[in-house]
């Protein structure tokens, strides 16, 4: 027996919307672009050259 949606998410759907309700995928992308973006405070951009193949043997 599969749980019903209200059993899986008793707090409701939250910020998620159906693509049909968002006006299609373009409306959803505009909603995502309008949201505030944040980066984790402990994330350090400590990547060296990701495309450096000189060290591959």
Curated annotation (Swiss-Prot):
InterPro entries: CSN9_metazoa. The keyword Nucleus applies. Coiled coil: none annotated. Belongs to the CSN9 family. Component of the COP9 signalosome complex (CSN), a complex involved in various cellular and developmental processes. The CSN complex is an essential regulator of the ubiquitin (Ubl) conjugation pathway by mediating the deneddylation of the cullin subunits of SCF-type E3 ligase complexes, leading to decrease the Ubl ligase activity. May play a role in cell proliferation. PANTHER family: COP9 SIGNALOSOME COMPLEX SUBUNIT 9. This is COP9 signalosome complex subunit 9. It comes from Xenopus laevis (African clawed frog).
